[in-house]
Amino acid sequence: VNFTTPLEWKSEAWWRNRSTAERLFHLHIPRRINDNMDKWKALDTAPDENLFLQGPSGSGKSLIAAKTLTTLIEDHKVSGRWVEADDYIEMIKDSFDNEGVLPEMYSSPHVVKYVKGVFDIVVIDGLGEERLTEFASHELGSLIRKRYDKQKTTIITSRLSIQDIKNRYGSRLANPLADFEHEVLRGKR
């Protein structure tokens, strides 16, 4: 079955009520991760539990996040999306350049709005790997804070500790992370 992403705005209920196969299709997990996650085990978590996965490069953070996301989508009637932190910043810039709507190269002109508050679960992969600018810090902080305030589940992967994140971005971004379930992964897997 070949699914397409709708160009017109869709509600939370619309995204939740798609088939499991369609909800998995719309996750947009990168192929390099999707092709390797079968070997990994999902974290035992509920669809309303925020997660912060910290560890060095190669420790399996992204694979565990992907496996956890897909398992939650398969086991519950929830919607989700995968987004790299640096790609999210590019999406925001592109939406500013196009009057709030993303150009055709993106899966949906509304993906930024969906990530901010429509999708039930969002993985933000590689927090701290993007080029640090005031703009990036503000936008990532805004995303995490909005999702936190709306009680939307967020799974974050980072090489940085919460203290490093606080030092890099400030408490606006770091404070919500104190309520996240925190997993520290050690070394290469």
Q: What are these language model-derived features?
A:
Residues 1-43, 181-183:
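A short, basic N-terminal segment
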Residues 48-66:
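Walker A/P-loop nucleotide-binding motif
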Residues 40, 114-115, 176-177:
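A generic structural signal for nonpolar/aromatic side chains embedded in well-ordered alpha-helices
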Residues 73-118:
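Short glycine-rich substrate-engagement loop in P-loop NTPases that contacts/grips substrate
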Residues 79, 118-121, 150-156:
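Loop/turn-to-beta-strand initiation segments
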Residues 52-54, 80-84, 156:
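A structural signal for short, well-ordered beta-strand segments and their strand-loop junctions
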